[in-house]
């Protein structure tokens, strides 16, 4: 099993720049195929091979840690995924590297949510990145928000309660995108919009209605016989999510992804939690 990387010369330059500016660098390692992921996780020799490559990669590029982003796994691979991280943990300890892992909200679909043993991951990793999105995703047959604040907070409580993840380990993942939903003859589809492009897509005369429970503006309009619905992510909705970090003493925030945002959102983040 080969871990393919695309850090390249530009990546090396970025790592050097980040370190010169006192940033820590944790590259993300992700999966792409459920059956191949299952094969790797279920075989000790393959897990060992991947772990060796991760350690070599961190050492070669002088990295500070690693972020494991395995999504879309079989529920039956839950224990083997935990085992993979348990085996990786001491190897990272030897080189002083941080281990973070991305997980979805509890109590969801088998291959999206039930494939994680959040309790064990919380005891193994330095940080648990809660991907607090998509509440209503691409496969949804119902239009809805990407990350309503009430839903986000409910799941934060689940991580801290039933999953027993330490608050200082829990990192709140915030989306820098939303979806524009299209309804035609009862059929629903959606496209992703970066928050920086929302005002370019929504008509200027469309009314924005504030939803107090979601902490979001909602817009609905018609065009050429198609009904469009958008739950807007902006400075106000993101601020509501950032407030959960201090409310529950969480370890910090993560974002998907950097270039989807705006200067005003980054300014807000800097003011709220001190990131520059």
PLM region spans:
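Short, acidic/polar
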Residues: 42-60, 110-118, 232-246
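Substrate-binding surface in catalytic domains of secreted glycosidases
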Residues: 2-9, 52, 75-203
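Hydrophobic faces of well-ordered beta-strands that scaffold small-molecule active sites
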Residues: 25-29, 66-68, 99-101, 128-130, ...
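Acidic/aromatic/glycine-rich contiguous surface patches that form carbohydrate-binding/processing clefts
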Residues: 241-276
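Second-shell loop/turn segments in exported
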Residues: 1-6, 37-44, 70-78, 140-147, ...
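Glycan-binding loop/region signatures in secreted carbohydrate-active enzymes
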Residues: 174-244, 273-276
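Short acidic, glycine/proline-enriched helix-loop-strand junctions
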Residues: 7-13, 20-21, 90, 94-97, ...
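Glycan-recognition patch characteristic of GH18 chitinases/ENGases
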Residues: 1-55
